[in-house]
């Protein structure tokens, strides 16, 4: 049985804190930050604004103290403005410095995870339960593309890659579906869970961030990692979202089966729309992945949360825990990792906001990819 641990990285802070690491923050003493945060409660507008502007310029290194103030300050104005600043600092941090990735700020909040008792379709592994996401985070607005993956990992394993198509001597029935198309902006697929973990670490290293994972006893098949001992660390690096974070971000405040409302005929997402769903008429079926950013985003500015490729999450797959939960991370051990969102080759009922799938972490398919999260 595979086991992965979750540990808290013991980061040592010098007199001049630099939580952001690299060029993402300015060095400012904690006492100065504390004084500026107190100024957020000033009765004078100019003093509040000056403090807010200085804090925002410092960048990620203010987030730890801002989060404490937003939760614990006895001054309502300090709590209010600290929460606003957290959003602004995260928004400024929501751009990859080495790729063209853009990230949306997913503000902390509460939601009902799973499928409501009276909603169709509902499966036994989707029991509704209250969940609280206690810390705002960043999530990629799009799935990782073939171009981005190749830039970081120096290889493109995708089946739906135009470069693999059109070989008359050795036809590729998968790649030939996208012959003549520009596929660099299609989502990367044929990715194991371990490959996604390795990508997150490499991207963190490329940008001077602290990697979110350790990987030991690695087993490879060609360019892909099929097994490894993985430990999760609490750092500022890139990572996979948890299953709860993924659904919270996908729903964007909705309680309907899809973040765009009730079922449609395949016109709102890249999925198998040629099978009727509930009262929906049969619709179109593309039959392969499509460019990220196709269709409409949800209210949080996230594209393709339904369909296209199913997305790896951090968690081991298993039954939900009972009762309210804060920042759940899934079972402590297991044999399968969670994929979310459904894909181009499955019907709508498998692409709902609450749809979940357990897949062996070493498995690679042309309908599975991932998107990246980060917690500065």
Regions found by a protein language model. Give the residues of each.
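Bacterial N-terminal signal peptides
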Residues: 10-20
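Short coil turns that connect the paired helices of HEAT/ARM alpha-solenoid repeats
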Residues: 40-46, 71-77
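Alpha-helix initiation and capping sites
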Residues: 29, 44, 55-63, 75
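Functional-site microenvironments in short loops/helix caps that host divalent-cation chemistry
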Residues: 112, 116-118, 182, 187, ...
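Short, structured beta-strand segments at or near domain termini in extracellular proteins/domains
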Residues: 366-376
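Structural detector for internal amphipathic alpha-helices that build alpha-solenoid repeat scaffolds
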Residues: 49-60, 80-89
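Amphipathic alpha-helical scaffolding segments comprising HEAT/armadillo-like alpha-solenoid repeats
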Residues: 30-38, 61-70
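A short glycine-rich, aromatic-capped structural motif
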Residues: 96-165, 189-205, 244, 249, ...
